[in-house]
Amino acid sequence: MHTSIVTLNLDAYQNFLANAIFCNLLLTMCLYWFSLIIVNNNLICNLAKFSAVNSNVILFFYLSWRWYNYNFFPLSNLYESLMFLSCLLLFIYQFIEFKTRSRVIGALVLPLIVLVQGFASLSLPTAMQKSSPLVPALQSNWLMLHVSMMMLSYATLLLGSLFSILYLVLYKDKKILTKKSIKEQFVEENFVFQLTTSAFSLNQTSNIITEAKTDRQRLILSLDNWSYRTIGIGFPFLTMGIISGAVWANEAWGSYWSWDPKETWALITWLIFASYLHARLTKGWRGKRAAFLGSFGFFIVWVCYLGVNFLGKGLHSYGFLN
Protein backbone atom coordinates (compact mmCIF):
# COMPACT_ATOMS: atom_id res chain seq x y z
CA MET A 1 0.00 0.00 0.00
CA HIS A 2 2.78 2.40 0.94
CA THR A 3 4.65 1.58 -2.29
CA SER A 4 1.53 2.31 -4.36
CA ILE A 5 1.10 5.71 -2.70
CA VAL A 6 4.75 6.60 -3.34
CA THR A 7 4.40 5.55 -6.99
CA LEU A 8 1.28 7.68 -7.40
CA ASN A 9 3.03 10.67 -5.85
CA LEU A 10 6.02 10.24 -8.17
CA ASP A 11 3.74 10.01 -11.22
CA ALA A 12 1.82 13.11 -10.13
CA TYR A 13 5.04 15.02 -9.57
CA GLN A 14 6.38 13.99 -12.98
CA ASN A 15 3.16 15.06 -14.69
CA PHE A 16 3.27 18.41 -12.91
CA LEU A 17 6.86 19.05 -13.99
CA ALA A 18 6.19 17.98 -17.58
CA ASN A 19 3.14 20.26 -17.83
CA ALA A 20 5.06 23.13 -16.22
CA ILE A 21 7.86 22.73 -18.77
CA PHE A 22 5.40 22.76 -21.68
CA CYS A 23 3.53 25.83 -20.38
CA ASN A 24 6.78 27.66 -19.73
CA LEU A 25 8.04 26.90 -23.23
CA LEU A 26 4.76 28.06 -24.75
CA LEU A 27 5.02 31.31 -22.79
CA THR A 28 8.64 31.72 -23.90
CA MET A 29 7.72 31.28 -27.55
CA CYS A 30 4.92 33.86 -27.27
CA LEU A 31 7.28 36.35 -25.59
CA TYR A 32 9.88 35.91 -28.32
CA TRP A 33 7.41 36.47 -31.11
CA PHE A 34 5.73 39.36 -29.29
CA SER A 35 9.07 41.13 -28.75
CA LEU A 36 10.14 40.46 -32.32
CA ILE A 37 7.01 41.43 -34.24
CA ILE A 38 4.89 43.71 -32.06
CA VAL A 39 6.92 45.51 -29.39
CA ASN A 40 10.71 45.70 -29.39
CA ASN A 41 11.07 46.23 -25.65
CA ASN A 42 14.15 45.34 -23.58
CA LEU A 43 12.06 44.21 -20.61
CA ILE A 44 10.09 41.74 -22.72
CA CYS A 45 13.29 40.56 -24.43
CA ASN A 46 14.98 39.89 -21.10
CA LEU A 47 11.87 38.19 -19.77
CA ALA A 48 11.79 35.92 -22.83
CA LYS A 49 15.45 34.98 -22.36
CA PHE A 50 14.95 34.34 -18.64
CA SER A 51 11.93 32.16 -19.38
CA ALA A 52 13.96 30.14 -21.90
CA VAL A 53 16.79 29.59 -19.42
CA ASN A 54 14.25 28.68 -16.74
CA SER A 55 12.68 26.10 -19.06
CA ASN A 56 16.05 24.53 -19.74
CA VAL A 57 16.93 24.38 -16.03
CA ILE A 58 13.60 22.74 -15.16
CA LEU A 59 13.95 20.27 -18.03
CA PHE A 60 17.51 19.40 -17.00
CA PHE A 61 16.36 18.90 -13.40
CA TYR A 62 13.48 16.72 -14.61
CA LEU A 63 15.79 14.43 -16.60
CA SER A 64 18.32 14.28 -13.76
CA TRP A 65 15.53 13.43 -11.33
CA ARG A 66 14.38 10.52 -13.52
CA TRP A 67 17.99 9.35 -13.80
CA TYR A 68 18.35 9.38 -10.01
CA ASN A 69 15.04 7.63 -9.33
CA TYR A 70 15.27 4.91 -11.98
CA ASN A 71 19.06 4.36 -11.83
CA PHE A 72 19.69 4.50 -15.57
CA PHE A 73 20.34 7.26 -18.08
CA PRO A 74 17.01 8.87 -19.13
CA LEU A 75 17.09 7.70 -22.74
CA SER A 76 15.36 4.36 -22.33
CA ASN A 77 12.15 5.15 -24.24
CA LEU A 78 10.60 7.56 -26.73
CA TYR A 79 9.28 9.92 -24.06
CA GLU A 80 12.67 10.41 -22.43
CA SER A 81 14.40 10.82 -25.78
CA LEU A 82 11.93 13.57 -26.75
CA MET A 83 12.59 15.32 -23.45
CA PHE A 84 16.32 14.98 -24.01
CA LEU A 85 15.97 16.35 -27.55
CA SER A 86 14.07 19.38 -26.22
CA CYS A 87 16.81 20.00 -23.66
CA LEU A 88 19.52 19.82 -26.33
CA LEU A 89 17.64 22.11 -28.72
CA LEU A 90 17.16 24.64 -25.92
CA PHE A 91 20.81 24.59 -24.93
CA ILE A 92 22.17 24.80 -28.49
CA TYR A 93 19.86 27.61 -29.58
CA GLN A 94 20.66 29.60 -26.42
CA PHE A 95 24.37 29.20 -27.16
CA ILE A 96 23.86 30.40 -30.75
CA GLU A 97 21.70 33.27 -29.53
CA PHE A 98 24.40 34.28 -27.04
CA LYS A 99 26.97 34.31 -29.84
CA THR A 100 24.82 36.13 -32.37
CA ARG A 101 22.78 38.30 -29.99
CA SER A 102 19.80 37.74 -32.25
CA ARG A 103 16.34 36.87 -30.93
CA VAL A 104 15.32 35.54 -34.33
CA ILE A 105 17.16 32.30 -33.55
CA GLY A 106 14.88 31.67 -30.57
CA ALA A 107 11.77 32.69 -32.50
CA LEU A 108 12.71 30.16 -35.18
CA VAL A 109 13.62 27.23 -32.92
CA LEU A 110 11.10 27.56 -30.07
CA PRO A 111 8.03 26.50 -32.12
CA LEU A 112 9.85 23.26 -32.92
CA ILE A 113 10.71 22.72 -29.25
CA VAL A 114 7.11 23.42 -28.21
CA LEU A 115 5.85 20.86 -30.74
CA VAL A 116 8.33 18.24 -29.53
CA GLN A 117 7.46 18.90 -25.90
CA GLY A 118 3.73 18.96 -26.60
CA PHE A 119 3.92 15.65 -28.45
CA ALA A 120 5.83 14.08 -25.55
CA SER A 121 3.63 15.45 -22.76
CA LEU A 122 0.18 15.55 -24.36
CA SER A 123 0.10 12.97 -27.17
CA LEU A 124 2.02 9.96 -25.92
CA PRO A 125 0.02 7.47 -23.84
CA THR A 126 0.69 7.56 -20.11
CA ALA A 127 2.16 4.06 -20.24
CA MET A 128 4.84 5.25 -22.67
CA GLN A 129 5.80 8.12 -20.37
CA LYS A 130 6.74 5.80 -17.52
CA SER A 131 10.17 4.26 -17.14
CA SER A 132 10.33 0.48 -17.03
CA PRO A 133 13.21 -1.91 -16.28
CA LEU A 134 15.63 -2.20 -19.18
CA VAL A 135 15.87 -5.47 -21.06
CA PRO A 136 19.27 -7.19 -20.66
CA ALA A 137 20.46 -6.08 -24.12
CA LEU A 138 19.99 -2.42 -23.13
CA GLN A 139 21.77 -2.74 -19.79
CA SER A 140 25.05 -1.55 -21.21
CA ASN A 141 27.31 1.49 -21.09
CA TRP A 142 26.82 1.70 -24.85
CA LEU A 143 23.29 2.98 -24.22
CA MET A 144 24.51 6.35 -22.97
CA LEU A 145 27.16 6.74 -25.68
CA HIS A 146 25.15 5.58 -28.67
CA VAL A 147 21.83 7.25 -27.90
CA SER A 148 23.36 10.52 -26.66
CA MET A 149 25.47 10.78 -29.84
CA MET A 150 22.41 10.17 -32.00
CA MET A 151 20.33 12.72 -30.09
CA LEU A 152 23.11 15.32 -30.33
CA SER A 153 23.26 14.71 -34.07
CA TYR A 154 19.47 15.02 -34.41
CA ALA A 155 19.43 18.31 -32.48
CA THR A 156 22.26 19.95 -34.45
CA LEU A 157 21.16 18.62 -37.84
CA LEU A 158 17.58 19.76 -37.23
CA LEU A 159 18.78 23.26 -36.35
CA GLY A 160 21.04 23.41 -39.41
CA SER A 161 18.19 22.24 -41.61
CA LEU A 162 15.87 24.83 -40.04
CA PHE A 163 18.31 27.56 -41.07
CA SER A 164 18.20 26.18 -44.62
CA ILE A 165 14.40 26.26 -44.61
CA LEU A 166 14.39 29.85 -43.35
CA TYR A 167 16.92 30.73 -46.05
CA LEU A 168 14.54 29.45 -48.75
CA VAL A 169 11.54 31.21 -47.20
CA LEU A 170 13.33 34.57 -47.01
CA TYR A 171 14.86 34.10 -50.45
CA LYS A 172 11.41 33.61 -51.96
CA ASP A 173 9.39 36.16 -49.94
CA LYS A 174 11.01 39.58 -49.64
CA LYS A 175 8.07 41.01 -47.68
CA ILE A 176 9.12 39.14 -44.53
CA LEU A 177 12.10 41.46 -44.16
CA THR A 178 10.05 44.65 -44.22
CA LYS A 179 9.57 44.57 -40.44
CA LYS A 180 12.32 46.77 -39.04
CA SER A 181 12.75 44.93 -35.74
CA ILE A 182 13.24 41.59 -37.50
CA LYS A 183 15.73 43.06 -39.94
CA GLU A 184 17.73 44.70 -37.19
CA GLN A 185 17.86 41.52 -35.15
CA PHE A 186 19.24 39.45 -37.98
CA VAL A 187 21.67 41.76 -39.69
CA GLU A 188 23.20 43.91 -36.97
CA GLU A 189 26.97 44.26 -37.33
CA ASN A 190 27.77 42.01 -34.38
CA PHE A 191 25.73 39.16 -35.85
CA VAL A 192 27.54 39.29 -39.17
CA PHE A 193 30.90 39.72 -37.44
CA GLN A 194 30.32 36.61 -35.33
CA LEU A 195 29.49 34.59 -38.41
CA THR A 196 32.32 35.80 -40.57
CA THR A 197 35.08 35.45 -37.98
CA SER A 198 34.13 31.97 -36.76
CA ALA A 199 36.72 29.23 -36.96
CA PHE A 200 34.17 27.12 -38.84
CA SER A 201 33.74 29.67 -41.66
CA LEU A 202 35.58 29.44 -44.94
CA ASN A 203 37.47 32.58 -45.95
CA GLN A 204 35.66 32.72 -49.26
CA THR A 205 32.23 32.58 -47.61
CA SER A 206 33.27 35.19 -45.07
CA ASN A 207 34.38 37.58 -47.81
CA ILE A 208 31.09 37.16 -49.64
CA ILE A 209 29.12 38.02 -46.50
CA THR A 210 31.28 41.03 -45.72
CA GLU A 211 30.98 42.39 -49.24
CA ALA A 212 27.21 42.00 -49.45
CA LYS A 213 25.66 45.36 -50.26
CA THR A 214 22.19 45.01 -48.78
CA ASP A 215 20.73 43.85 -45.48
CA ARG A 216 18.76 41.17 -47.27
CA GLN A 217 21.87 39.78 -48.94
CA ARG A 218 23.75 39.77 -45.67
CA LEU A 219 20.86 38.04 -43.94
CA ILE A 220 20.41 35.16 -46.37
CA LEU A 221 24.16 34.65 -46.81
CA SER A 222 24.60 34.55 -43.05
CA LEU A 223 21.82 31.98 -42.78
CA ASP A 224 23.47 29.90 -45.48
CA ASN A 225 26.78 30.00 -43.63
CA TRP A 226 25.23 29.28 -40.23
CA SER A 227 23.33 26.30 -41.66
CA TYR A 228 26.56 24.91 -43.09
CA ARG A 229 28.43 25.28 -39.82
CA THR A 230 25.68 23.69 -37.71
CA ILE A 231 25.29 20.71 -40.04
CA GLY A 232 29.08 20.40 -40.09
CA ILE A 233 29.02 20.01 -36.30
CA GLY A 234 26.12 17.54 -36.28
CA PHE A 235 27.53 15.21 -38.95
CA PRO A 236 30.42 13.84 -36.79
CA PHE A 237 27.95 13.15 -33.98
CA LEU A 238 25.79 11.16 -36.41
CA THR A 239 28.84 9.22 -37.60
CA MET A 240 29.91 8.38 -34.04
CA GLY A 241 26.33 7.40 -33.17
CA ILE A 242 26.10 4.96 -36.08
CA ILE A 243 29.52 3.42 -35.35
CA SER A 244 28.83 3.03 -31.62
CA GLY A 245 25.45 1.50 -32.43
CA ALA A 246 27.08 -1.04 -34.73
CA VAL A 247 29.61 -2.03 -32.06
CA TRP A 248 26.86 -2.31 -29.46
CA ALA A 249 24.71 -4.42 -31.81
CA ASN A 250 27.60 -6.81 -32.33
CA GLU A 251 28.03 -7.22 -28.58
CA ALA A 252 24.31 -7.69 -27.96
CA TRP A 253 23.17 -9.69 -30.99
CA GLY A 254 26.37 -10.84 -32.70
CA SER A 255 25.99 -8.70 -35.83
CA TYR A 256 27.30 -5.23 -36.65
CA TRP A 257 24.56 -4.48 -39.16
CA SER A 258 21.20 -6.18 -39.71
CA TRP A 259 19.43 -3.70 -42.03
CA ASP A 260 16.91 -2.91 -39.33
CA PRO A 261 14.60 -0.07 -40.57
CA LYS A 262 16.23 2.33 -38.09
CA GLU A 263 19.71 1.36 -39.26
CA THR A 264 18.71 1.77 -42.89
CA TRP A 265 17.28 5.25 -42.34
CA ALA A 266 20.25 6.27 -40.23
CA LEU A 267 22.43 5.36 -43.21
CA ILE A 268 20.14 7.33 -45.55
CA THR A 269 20.37 10.33 -43.20
CA TRP A 270 24.16 10.02 -43.13
CA LEU A 271 24.31 9.90 -46.94
CA ILE A 272 22.06 12.96 -47.31
CA PHE A 273 24.17 15.14 -45.03
CA ALA A 274 27.42 13.67 -46.37
CA SER A 275 26.23 14.74 -49.83
CA TYR A 276 25.42 18.21 -48.48
CA LEU A 277 28.89 18.67 -46.98
CA HIS A 278 30.60 17.14 -50.01
CA ALA A 279 28.73 19.47 -52.36
CA ARG A 280 29.71 22.50 -50.29
CA LEU A 281 33.33 21.55 -49.76
CA THR A 282 34.26 20.19 -53.19
CA LYS A 283 31.61 21.48 -55.60
CA GLY A 284 31.26 24.99 -54.21
CA TRP A 285 27.54 24.66 -53.58
CA ARG A 286 25.93 27.45 -51.59
CA GLY A 287 22.71 29.39 -51.67
CA LYS A 288 19.53 27.79 -53.01
CA ARG A 289 21.00 24.46 -54.11
CA ALA A 290 22.63 23.79 -50.74
CA ALA A 291 19.54 25.06 -48.89
CA PHE A 292 17.25 22.68 -50.80
CA LEU A 293 19.42 19.73 -49.84
CA GLY A 294 19.70 20.92 -46.24
CA SER A 295 15.93 21.44 -46.01
CA PHE A 296 15.34 17.94 -47.35
CA GLY A 297 17.52 16.67 -44.52
CA PHE A 298 15.09 18.16 -41.98
CA PHE A 299 12.36 15.73 -43.03
CA ILE A 300 14.78 12.81 -43.37
CA VAL A 301 15.91 13.29 -39.76
CA TRP A 302 12.31 13.15 -38.54
CA VAL A 303 11.63 9.99 -40.55
CA CYS A 304 14.78 8.42 -39.10
CA TYR A 305 14.04 9.51 -35.55
CA LEU A 306 10.27 8.98 -35.31
CA GLY A 307 8.80 7.62 -38.54
CA VAL A 308 10.38 4.17 -38.65
CA ASN A 309 9.98 3.70 -34.89
CA PHE A 310 6.19 3.70 -35.13
CA LEU A 311 6.01 0.92 -37.72
CA GLY A 312 6.09 -1.76 -35.02
CA LYS A 313 8.97 -3.56 -36.73
CA GLY A 314 12.65 -3.88 -35.94
CA LEU A 315 14.80 -3.57 -32.84
CA HIS A 316 14.06 0.15 -32.40
CA SER A 317 10.26 -0.07 -32.52
CA TYR A 318 8.07 1.82 -30.06
CA GLY A 319 4.86 0.23 -31.36
CA PHE A 320 2.86 3.45 -30.87
CA LEU A 321 0.67 2.89 -33.93
CA ASN A 322 -0.08 -0.75 -33.23
From Swiss-Prot:
Cellular compartments annotated: Plastid, Chloroplast thylakoid membrane
Keywords from the UniProt entry: Chloroplast, Cytochrome c-type biogenesis, Membrane, Plastid, Thylakoid, Transmembrane, Transmembrane helix
Residues that span the membrane, as ranges: 19-39, 43-63, 72-92, 104-124, 150-170, 230-250, 264-281, 291-311
GO CC terms, sorted: chloroplast thylakoid membrane; plasma membrane
Gene Ontology MF annotations: heme binding
Superkingdom field: Eukaryota
Topology class, membrane: Multi-pass membrane protein
Main localization category: plastid
Entries under InterPro entries matching the protein: Cyt_c_assembly (IPR002541), Cyt_c_biogenesis_CcsA (IPR017562), Cyt_c_biogenesis_CcsA/CcmC (IPR045062)
Pfam families xrefs: Cytochrom_C_asm
GO terms for biological process, alphabetical: cytochrome complex assembly
The protein's role, per its UniProt record: Required during biogenesis of c-type cytochromes (cytochrome c6 and cytochrome f) at the step of heme attachment.
Oligomer status and interactors: May interact with Ccs1.
Membership in a protein family: Belongs to the CcmF/CycK/Ccl1/NrfE/CcsA family.
Record's protein name: Cytochrome c biogenesis protein CcsA
Organism: Heterosigma akashiwo (strain NIES-293 / 8280G21-1)
Taxonomic classification: Eukaryota, Sar, Stramenopiles, Ochrophyta, Raphidophyceae
Gene name, Swiss-Prot/TrEMBL: ccsA
